[in-house]
């Protein structure tokens, strides 16, 4: 066959138009038929040759397998190495003979082998190897030829028994292999399951996070998740709150998001607030969704109607007194701030009045401070306040109501409410003044306010808010906490951006923090109020620098967040309406551009 193939190839190559035995397209049409015919003639040889090589290889493999089985069997039976070698050699030779003729004829392709010049014992010169020489034994075999000669009779006699015994061994081996493979497969499947399950878990968690960011249901899931981890977090947070590192990890996560405080707070409060937990985008979304959820869940609650009341609860108790008292009272924020805060305070106060039950939950005294301020505002801007309340409620529902309500509750648990009022007022003033323009002095009052009024929040936030914006977050929380926060942030004009940004983070923080106050009240918030009030002031001072930095960060973050909140993609109706209402209430559309910017 090889000669025919070679001849065919040579003849093909000899044709001027063929290269490597294949006709070239450029060749003249006359040469094509010849080349094709030659190729066809050569094909069977090529195919047979390939088959032969493959079959030879398989034959060799089969023989070696059987020889190995025989060797193992003999070793098990206790034969000496020499005996084993001799028997294996003879067995191999016999197998080669059988493979060459007898076995091959019974198998597909055996006819090809029979057709080939190879004889039972002869090796075709063209093949890779000669199966064996009669006297020298198999060419590949290392055993001496005498081995094979002496044991040929033995081979033929014991062929059936030896061959029969090896196959069972094959079966055994196969079984063992199957068992092993099964075990391996199981292990691999388990490993893969384990790995896949982690992946799935990760994917699920990612999906859950996405859902949480977008769904209130997911928020609940977060809450549940965070609750389990909350216990740990609460303990950690209790310890960390005192060090002001409530949850550095959370901080890092939320801080990276820019609302690390709100995330930490939100994480403290619950993962539902963990919108803040979520990456900044997710936090914003989570805040938005959280606010929506909170608005959904909180707005259902009376404070939901006065979602702003709930924000006012947060801001109202600490931030309102701070934002309302601070803004209107401190007038640190531009007159717009006091005026807009006062309207907002009024709205919030009005909302607080409707939501005093909810606010009452939080801290009637801070409430009363913002309420008293807001009450005058209420009288002045009752209708406008109501409208704003509605808008704010929407907003608070969407973003602040849940945290704000919780925040209110937090002020409630926080005995530092009085201080939170003064602090929040100072914060609002300092936040509005320093948070926006005088972070240095402002942060202290703001941080104090946050620590005092938000004592819990501030304490929670200082660790969080400090990185993001502790005082601003308190102040921002106050501003955020109440629509005032937004209105203030918007009304302040230039500061509105920072405030709106810090507020939006603060809002998310205050929301999450305030929300957390509820859940933190579960563990951290009550402790936080005390530790925050105590540590809050120290932290407020300590975090004043941090808070100023965090405020700047949070402002930068919060503007982005606010944009996200305001972005029609997340909460178009509520955010836009709430943002528009806040803007219109506080400064009008003008402040919106700064937050958006």
Curated annotation (Swiss-Prot):
Residues 149-158, 168-186, 199-211, 219-243, 384-412, 550-565 have a biased composition (Basic residues). Residues 315-328, 374-383 have a biased composition (Gly residues). Residues 1-47, 99-597 are annotated as: Disordered. Residues 1-31 have a biased composition (Polar residues). It comes from the Eukaryota. Residues 55-98 form the CWF21 domain. GO terms for molecular function: mRNA binding. Residues 99-109, 530-549 have a biased composition (Basic and acidic residues). Expressed in breast cancer cell lines. Residues 257-278, 291-313, 417-433, 466-476, 488-507 have a biased composition (Low complexity). Disulfide bonds: none annotated. One of its GO terms (cellular component) is nucleus. SMART domains: cwf21. PANTHER family: SERINE/ARGININE REPETITIVE MATRIX PROTEIN 3-RELATED (PTHR34755), SERINE_ARGININE REPETITIVE MATRIX PROTEIN 3 (PTHR34755:SF2). Belongs to the CWC21 family. May play a role in regulating breast cancer cell invasiveness. May be involved in RYBP-mediated breast cancer progression. This is Serine/arginine repetitive matrix protein 3. It comes from Homo sapiens (Human).
